[in-house]
Amino acid sequence: MKINSPLEAYKYLPQTNCGECGQPTCMAFASTLIDRSGKTTDCPPLIKEKKFAKKLAELDRLLAPEIRQVTIGVGERAANIGGDDVLYRHKLTFFNKTKMFFDVADNMDEAAIVERVKKISDYKKFYVGRNLLLDGVAIRAASNDPAKFATAVKKVIENTELPVILCSFNPAVLKAGLEVAKGKNPLLYAANKDNWKEVGELALEYNVPVVVSAFNDLDGLKTLAKTFAEAGIKDIVLDPGTYPTGKGLKDTFTNFLKIRRAGIMGDTEIAYPIMAMPLTAWMAGIADPVSASYWETVLSSIFTIRYGDIMLLHSMEPYATMPEVHLAETIYTDPRSPVAVDSKMYKVGNPTADSPVLFTTNFALTYYTVESDLASNGIDCWLLAVNTDGIGVEAAAAGGQLTADKVKDAFEKSGFDLKSDVTHNSVVIPGLAARLQGDIEDKLNVKVMVGPMDSGRLPGWMEKNWPPKK
């Protein structure tokens, strides 16, 4: 994105404040364009009226991310990769979390293919209020047989809505897979110095994204990308090679940095998403599968942190997948807006009028930790999330985001009446907010009980202190 101010975007808008975009003014709409919550297509006059055509074209150029965004697959589970504007998250944010594709091979039994595909599709890990999922299936042509590969591709797409990558350096094999996957917008892997012409023709014929590959050869990689772009292929992914150990790993890491830095700094010929292949850990001569899986996770972590937009992985063991999806979720959290839950009164279990009332902040990690500690120990209660702008208890209490007035306001907005909805007229507050006890008692005219410093101690605390003494 070559502009970062709503004022700069505003110059290219109709400036009529018609409201057709859903915003009250064109300046408000310009703000949505800058933070990427809105698109130029949301402005009907800009799209429909010919007099704005030049402004629209220029605005689209200015708003385009420095790294091209590429879409793989179709429908709700389509995977968007790339689309970044910065090298460091704190300067804006990272967009389009690293996508993780897990492999199947066409020489596996059909039943084994189906089982693995369903395992990939059904993977779900609840974390801080959302489900973390896997993103797609990479189908490897281990047999190098077009017919066998086509059968495997057919079996995969019959059993999942996830996007797929067709993996082979043999154009005939890729063509067989493309025939089966028509309309699914698969990613082709890959074009190299030997097959680039044939694979490029396939990408154009079937209108699908394609990977260009040159192992540890950035000049060759750039040449391939430039050649494909000049041929009219827009959706390109870069594979500089992923060496799993030693100097090769160091070179791989350096190549990722060079590619992304060049793209962000304006070299459009190489400003494309980057593919990492942590599954090369299984080719590093590590005999023990647990150790190989561990090293694959290490590689995944390295390239999640440093510019890997899409990854090919193998191990489906929980000890491998959990850290991979957790790290990606953490790195791609938007620093401009802390992860928060709605500020309201929540029921934990099946609370009654005799159940305890507690509050915490609306920082998602804090809320779900407290809620989990209560629910897992069978404590039925009322739990209020106070709006602290997504800040945890200790920091919010110290910084003024958590005050007695904020707590009172949260109770009032929730519609929960401590005098009529419960029989005990008591509130349990976090131990880290003990300093607020007196103020809350004065503001709410209730009995305030100071809970433990850590929500993990709530079960023991409840046994000793609940119900409150009259």
Swiss-Prot record:
Keywords: 4Fe-4S, Cobalt, Iron, Iron-sulfur, Metal-binding, Methanogenesis, Methyltransferase, Transferase. Its EC number is 2.1.1.245. It catalyses: 5,6,7,8-tetrahydrosarcinapterin + methyl-Co(III)-[corrinoid Fe-S protein] = 5-methyltetrahydrosarcinapterin + Co(I)-[corrinoid Fe-S protein] + H(+). Signal peptide: none annotated. Pathway: One-carbon metabolism; methanogenesis from acetate. Residues 1-60 form the 4Fe-4S domain. GO terms for biological process: acetyl-CoA catabolic process; methanogenesis, from acetate; methylation. PROSITE patterns: 4FE4S. Its cofactor is corrinoid; [4Fe-4S] cluster. [4Fe-4S] cluster binds at C18, C21, C26, C43. GO terms for molecular function: 4 iron, 4 sulfur cluster binding; iron ion binding; methyltransferase activity. The keyword Thylakoid does not apply. InterPro entries: 4Fe-4S_dom, Ac-CoA_synth_d_su_TIM-brl, ACDS_complex_subunit, AcylCoA_decarb/synth_gsu, AcylCoA_decarb/synth_gsu_arc, Dihydropteroate_synth-like_sf. Binds 1 [4Fe-4S] cluster. Part of a complex that catalyzes the reversible cleavage of acetyl-CoA, allowing growth on acetate as sole source of carbon and energy. Heterodimer of delta and gamma chains. The ACDS complex is made up of alpha, epsilon, beta, gamma and delta chains with a probable stoichiometry of (alpha(2)epsilon(2))(4)-beta(8)-(gamma(1)delta(1))(8). This is Acetyl-CoA decarbonylase/synthase complex subunit gamma 2. The gene is cdhE2.
